[in-house]
């Protein structure tokens, strides 16, 4: 086994997996899967690794031994005792962060609060600066409702929660848009001038 080196991705083979076949779910391996995730988190926390890359896992088998498991993001937050986490999907052309994760669609609107938006944008802004070396990130926020609520005509979340959060963040000199309509947010112009979307 090689030690941690720059420009090296180390793949660690952890044994004790029950026999498997591709395309089949084995609840008997739930503990094995969770132990692998725990090991990877521990290695990263103790600075033995510089990053953690997770592959997909079957939530159904994990839930068989941990009823509160909803996904990597929330699990890592629990293990690390972090105040806040943010899931971001990133490529060279596009970065999209999620305000909510792993909850039923019926619960999304009541989960969107001023505090949640402020917390997520602060994490996003900080990570764009520290992890992506962007000095003054430009962040655009999508509305929750069609056409960003049309000033309260198609839902009130933008007026009650999202806009007040964004006004608060602007006072802290965070370069952020007001809520955009999701159907037009990813225009060529917006893609060119935006470092990340929430």
For every predicted segment, state its role.
Residues 1-197:
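Anion-binding alpha/beta catalytic cores of soluble intermediary-metabolism enzymes, centered on
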């Amino acid at each position: 086994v090689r030690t941690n080196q720059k420009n090296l991705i180390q793949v660690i083979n952890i044994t004790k997996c029950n026999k498997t076949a591709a395309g089949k779910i084995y609840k008997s391996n739930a503990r094995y899967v969770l132990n692998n995730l725990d090991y990877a988190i521990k290695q990263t926390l103790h600075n033995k690794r510089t990053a953690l890359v997770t592959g997909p896992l079957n939530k159904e088998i994990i839930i068989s031994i941990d009823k509160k498991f909803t996904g990597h993001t929330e699990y890592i937050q629990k293990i690390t005792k972090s105040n806040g986490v943010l899931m971001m999907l990133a490529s060279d052309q596009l970065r999209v962060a999620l305000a909510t994760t792993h909850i039923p669609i019926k619960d999304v609107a009541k989960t969107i609060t001023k505090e949640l938006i402020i917390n997520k944008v602060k994490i996003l802004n900080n990570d764009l600066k520290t992890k992506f070396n962007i000095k003054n990130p430009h962040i655009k926020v999508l509305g929750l409702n069609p056409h960003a609520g049309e000033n309260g005509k198609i839902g009130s979340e933008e007026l009650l929660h999202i806009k007040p959060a964004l006004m608060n963040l602007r006072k802290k000199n965070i370069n952020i848009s007001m809520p955009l309509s999701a159907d037009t947010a990813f225009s060529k112009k917006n893609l060119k001038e935006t470092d990340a979307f929430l």
